[in-house]
Amino acid sequence: MKRQLAALLLTIFALSLTACGETAAESETRTVYAMDTVMNLTVYGENAAAALESAEKELHTLDEAVLSRTAEGSELYALNTSNGETVEYGADDILPALIETALTISDATDGAFDPTLAPVLDAWGFTKDERRVPSADELKELLSHTGCGKVVLEKTADGWPVTLLDGAQLDLGGIAKGYAADLLRAQLEKEGVTSATLDLGGDVFVMGRKTDGSDWRIAVKDPADTESYLGVVSAADKFIVTSGVYERYFEENGVRYHHILDPKTGCPAESGLVSVTVLCENGAWADALSTACFVLGPDGALALRDDLADQGTDFELILVTDDGRVLYTDGLADAFTPNDESGYTYEALA
């Protein structure tokens, strides 16, 4: 399950680091199982119970009726099995809007984030729990059916026609939880909520500030030691998403294969990174960028950050390299507190 172990650690640290100043009467917490992971939602304020009820319903609807690749009644399943025929969606439907966002991010990252890798992920067994190493010929054939150019999406006054060409299929797992967090944020705002923490299986959103006015403090997991952490981030109104090699992997003949695939090769990305944490004001972007930056490697990730900043999309990074360094961007200079006992070398980037 993607980021499930990360979810547990983040939840533990989030609760332990933010509890000061809060009382049980001021908050409501609910644990939800959706999107193949355990989610922990905590909402503060008078409308907390009603807001959580709405949030849980929204999550189950997204999971079961919209985004599941395997549930035959879901919209994504129907699209993936449409055999090249155009599927019409309403103007307010969630799935085409999410696909549009995924295509936009794929273009912005020059394909480092690619939502069309469904058949390649299946071949590796990461979506089926039947792990294996595909042959080079098999990967070459599967990759010929990937690429966002095979997704035709239009937005009209009446709705969204979507067509998948040449056997293309979508896997939105790299963006779905972030997008869901965006929707939950909007739902909570409608309910009048101003303070909350949403941990959607490791995709964490801290809404507003704590009720005492201070920032939330979230621990970032150590990819080499799942019982420890790299450091603590102070944040308000931010999404914090981590992608790492420890989340889903298997070993064969002494080689470890992780689930973050390079869209160009169809193989696990070898970028010099073992973990990427993104902090951003948008959940879908944070989710997808964590994957893209991992694929791009340190230099590519930092170049992408600069490019997107020029276009009005700002985000911060914590990069863990395979030689034991932790690189964090200048926007975190006062917000990230390294764990000096972790054994890493920390570098604040100018």
Locate each region found by the language model.
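Mature catalytic core of soluble alpha/beta enzymes
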Residues: 2-8, 12-350
